Amino acid sequence: MKMLQSVCLACALTLPAHGFAAASAEVDAIVERAAGHRVLLVGEIHGTVEVPAAVADLAQQIAAVERPLIVGLEIWRGEQQAIDRFMDSAGTYEDRTQLLAGEFWTREYQDGRSSAAMLELLDRLRALALKSDLRVVAFDEDPVADLDGAARDKAMAERLARALDEQPEAVALVLAGNFHTRVQASAPWDPEHRFMGHHLIDYQPYSLEIMGVAGSAWTCTGAEVDSCKARDLPANSIKPELTLGDEIGERGHHGVWWLPTVSASAPATAPPTATFP
């Protein structure tokens, strides 16, 4: 454990202060468009630097409205106490050590949700909470629950709904994988499946995907640990742009923000000397 902690700390201390700043015009447009909704769902492909950074920028803009803000992250709910402790801390070396000691961060199967970029997002939210009414909610089920996809989506939505009901005056900004954030009434593979976003329909969600046209992401392609690594995104002809619609699109969201490029973010507990293939 001591060796693991030293590796974690070395990585944590090499995090950039703000490795990516989302374009302010796009962030402003998203916040303005979502202003009439209680929940802003952000769907991602896990494991990039840029999307968690964009979520931090969105949180900063939304918090400026001076309404209580709930930021939901697809982290195991068993980590909630450690997150609360970190949010109340000064963000020191020791504080990061304590946070990164959790099983979510140290697990072998690193799927991009426990990346250095996610740690940086939490640190930016911690700093923002010093001057704003903001709290972070870890809404994913712990793995011991062993739920199927539909049950997990429902459980995640219920966790977020409870947080919203506890603070009727609050709005929520939620980051999750871009299947969970779909608000459509069914799944392409199962007309009975309900995504997390659809379960939150009573809370007037606005759903937006943020993804990269080019670059790389830390992803897993199977259940095996060695399937998780940095991968280049496939070539495509998509144009980088922000589209904010009024209706649910073919991808199950209201809008999409295609960033020109994204870059893979390694696990927060990876050795700082780790290189990408």
Which ranges hold each PLM region?
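Compositional signal for N-terminal targeting/processing segments
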Residues: G19-P277
